[in-house]
Amino acid sequence: AIDLRGHGESEAAKTMRWNRIADYVDDVSHAVEIIGGKPILVGHSMGGFICQHISHRNEPVSGIALLASAPHYGVWRLVFRMLVKDPLALILSFAKLSLLPVIRSTHAIRDMFLDANTPDPKVKAFGAKLIDESFLAFLDMLLLDLPKRAATIPPMLVIGGEKDTVCLPSEQQSLADYYGVACHIIEDAPHNLMSQTKWQEAADKLAEWVETRA
C-alpha cells in the first residue's frame, strides 16, 4: 500500500492542510516509478480520485481499480447531502478548515464508513485511527482539480457498495459509464467495503479482474 505524504508512515513535506491533490498524484507517480514494470493501481475513496488523475498522465500501469471512489465530477453532491444531514458539522468544517467535525460522533463514523450493525466499541476504535485530511485537497475534489478523461485510458474497474453513503452506488455507476468500464455494486456493503463483512465479495471481484490483466 502507498502511504501518501503525511499519511501512515510517510513524512509530511508540509502541514497536511496545504497538501493538494496534485501532490498526492505526484506521490503515486513516484511510487509507480520505484516499483517498476506496469503495476495495477487500486484506489479507494480519495485514492480512486487520485488514480483517475493518474489515468490521463500516461503512467506505465496495466490497470486501475476504483473502489468506492470519489466521482469524476467531484464531491459536491456529498457536500449537499452533508448539508442536509448535519449542517452544523459542515459549517464547522469550513470554519475550521478541517474535515474532523464531520466525523465528530460515533453515529457519523458508522453511517459514513462501516456496517450498520457495527458495535460502538469497534466504531470508536476505528474512529481513533482516523486523521484529518487536507482541506485544500478536499476543495480540489469539490471543484478545483477534477480529473480529465484522456483519449486513451488504461483498463479500469469500478466497485461500489450498496449501502455507501459517501460515494453512492449511483455515483459509482456514473463513474463507470464515464470511463466506459464495468461497475460492480456489492450488496449491503458500506463505504469501507474492503474491511467490513462483505470484504470477501469485493476482494473476489477485484481478484477476478486482476487475473484478466495478468
Kindly label every feature range from the protein language model.
Residues 1-13:
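Conserved alpha/beta-hydrolase
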Residues 38-75:
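Conserved hydrolase catalytic core segment
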Residues 165-174:
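Conserved alpha/beta-hydrolase "acid-adjacent" motif
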Residues 23-39:
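Conserved acidic catalytic loop of the alpha/beta-hydrolase fold
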Residues 182-214:
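Catalytic active-site module of serine/aspartate enzymes centered on a nucleophile-bearing elbow/loop
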